[in-house]
Every structure is written in C-alpha cells, then in structure tokens.
Amino acid sequence: MALKVRVITPDRTVLDDSVEEVILPSSSGQIGILSGHAPLLTALESGVIRVRTSGWENIAITDGFAEVEANEVKVLVNTAAKGQDIDLEEARKAFESAKAQLDQVNAADRKAILDARKELKRTRARYMAAGGMA
C-alpha cells in the first residue's frame, strides 16, 4: 500500500507523490514512516527528508511540522528544496561559510550563537540533500 507524501512551503508544493517510505528529521530524532503508521503530529528541525520510491530522493527543509494520518504524510515547512535542484558546490561553500561564521561569533552573544547555529543547520541540510557529506 502506498504512502501519500506532500511537502508544502508557504509559496509552493515541493513534493506531492506516492512513496514507499519517508524519513523525517523530527525534533526528537529521525522518524521512519511506512504505510499503516499510527497517527502522529511532530515538530521538524532543519534537516533532510528522505523519500523512497524506486530509489531515494533527498529534500532539504527548515523547521516545520509533519502530520501522519491514514497513509498520508503532510509536511509543512518554511522552506524546502529537492536535492537535485541544489547546486552542490554552492551548498558546500555556504556550509563552510556558516561553519566559519559560528567559529567567529562572540561567545557572550547568545542570540548571535543561536542564529549562527540555525544557519549552520540550514546550510548543512542543503549540502547533505545535494549529495555532500556522504
């Protein structure tokens, strides 16, 4: 039995397809969803959603929520991009820049540290979805 997955941002639907499995980056760790999964509502962190049909596809996301109900997974996030649509070299450069920025943040500036960590997670997700950090 197929699992219907929709990944939706405020301005577009990134994925609307039937898949065999989806792995979500929840706030408590990765969650694998198969057909027949129990109903679930979970917070998502910036990371990579992996969906499996005949092969695996990666989608980089920022924070949001996922709802699982009746063999349907609805993912509502601020931003999302399919790995195949992300330039690997640009993603690598952005990730390296975010790492350097975090290293340079004033340790006393808690907001700056949080912002830099958030940017690092976002750029890491894009780099991983594009095929980096294998």
Swiss-Prot record:
Xref: Gene3D superfamilies: F0F1 ATP synthase delta/epsilon subunit, N-terminal, Helix hairpin bin
Keyword terms, alphabetized: ATP synthesis, CF(1), Hydrogen ion transport, Ion transport, Membrane, Thylakoid, Transport
Family matches, as SUPFAM superfamilies: Epsilon subunit of F1F0-ATP synthase N-terminal domain
Subcellular localization, as worded in the UniProt entry: Cellular thylakoid membrane
GO CC annotations, alphabetized: plasma membrane-derived thylakoid membrane; proton-transporting ATP synthase complex
One matching Pfam family: ATP-synt_DE_N
Signal peptide: none
Membrane topology listed for this record: Peripheral membrane protein
Entry function: Produces ATP from ADP in the presence of a proton gradient across the membrane.
Matching PANTHER family: ATP SYNTHASE DELTA/EPSILON CHAIN, ATP SYNTHASE EPSILON CHAIN, CHLOROPLASTIC
Top-rank lineage group of the source organism: Bacteria
Matching InterPro entries: ATP_synth_F1_dsu/esu, ATP_synth_F1_dsu/esu_N, ATPsynth_dsu/esu_N
MF terms (GO), sorted A to Z: ATP binding; proton-transporting ATP synthase activity, rotational mechanism
HAMAP family: ATP_synth_epsil_bac (MF_00530)
Entry similarity comment: Belongs to the ATPase epsilon chain family.
Protein name (record): ATP synthase epsilon chain
Source organism of the structure: Picosynechococcus sp. (strain ATCC 27264 / PCC 7002 / PR-6)
Assembly with partners or alone: F-type ATPases have 2 components, CF(1) - the catalytic core - and CF(0) - the membrane proton channel. CF(1) has five subunits: alpha(3), beta(3), gamma(1), delta(1), epsilon(1). CF(0) has three main subunits: a, b and c.
